[in-house]
């Protein structure tokens, strides 16, 4: 016996069909990318978010199986959601053809959407719709791993979620893209909200009197060893982890090498994400 719920009878019956198909498929279905690990830094009228690249290496075995390995890694991009309540009701604004809230809308600041995707030829509206709506894959912006929100009010509580998403399937398999889950849990007795790795709760505020923010001398990083023709510029994203009067050394390692074995037809092969 099971209980099916929905916004109305039609929505509940649709959810029943999805549950039945999932059962008949032995719970084998496409997997959303893992959520990134997000850190928030609050400031005076400002919130900075930054996150790691762990989501970009997520393997989707189901997609890999049905595409003969072509879409084993179908990561596509990141989106930032912002709300003033932990249920993210502020962001649940995209409804399907029946008026049911279905997708969250990426946060928009000064007319610019907080969404970034790979430059891989996959952009715009995904061809497969979900009850009359389509998923926007992005506009070939390239990836970023930090974001600054300057449209905040000191003393106001905000919740941010950084989700990774994939590009799904196509019209041959009718698999739509999916976001990584926003993991949070509310204790019904105490009201305490437990946040997952990609959700943060912040209250921006001015710094305490006498606070001196982390800084560094010079405009560029001095090249001390190795072969390189590039220039490296610094930006301190999280001043709280920079220790006073310390000297830091930054090292880089190639993430790719020439593919002389003809692997998968590519001219480079990724070895590591970063060090």
Which residues does each PLM region occupy?
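Extracellular/surface-associated beta-sandwich interaction domains
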Residues: 1-275
